[in-house]
Amino acid sequence: AYVHASMFSVMALFALGDGGYAWEELEKSMVISHQMTTKSPFVFSNSYCENQDEGIFGFSAIDWFTGSGTVFIKNILRAGFGIEPDLLGLNLKTCAVMPCKKAHISLTVKGKRICVEYKNSGVGKRRIQIDGRDLRTSYDSIRRTECAHISTADLHDNMRIQILD
């Protein structure tokens, strides 16, 4: 199997609310960290061609490196942390199952520097806070998680977003 293709199945697992399995498959896709792996970071190019001067007809000579790492990171950001910018602002759909007790990431969204922090303190009911204030959430029955939306107008530099379980 190829990492690049596997990332699309991982994305689907997250979207369908099977976060535990998605994290397992994501971990398997880190081919550099395993002695024995079932995935390749390469993909067949499918660029079958004809070149009479070189005697090439109907085959692809070699694998080529893909954007596997990019799609891997995209899965962590969009599906794991659930950071999904859209035209109206920022959606937060953090995976219901996180593989760690704490995680954080700082990034720029719509020109504003934000920090998203996840913490599992065993409370059981997910809360999402902005700068220490609870944000109204809604339950996504497909992803099986609490979600929130922050409008573009409400985004500001050094915003601290906390997802608390």
Per-region residue spans from a language model:
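Non-catalytic C-terminal accessory modules of carbohydrate-active enzymes
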Residues: 8-165
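Generic helix N-cap/helix-start motif at coil->alpha-helix transitions
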Residues: 1-3
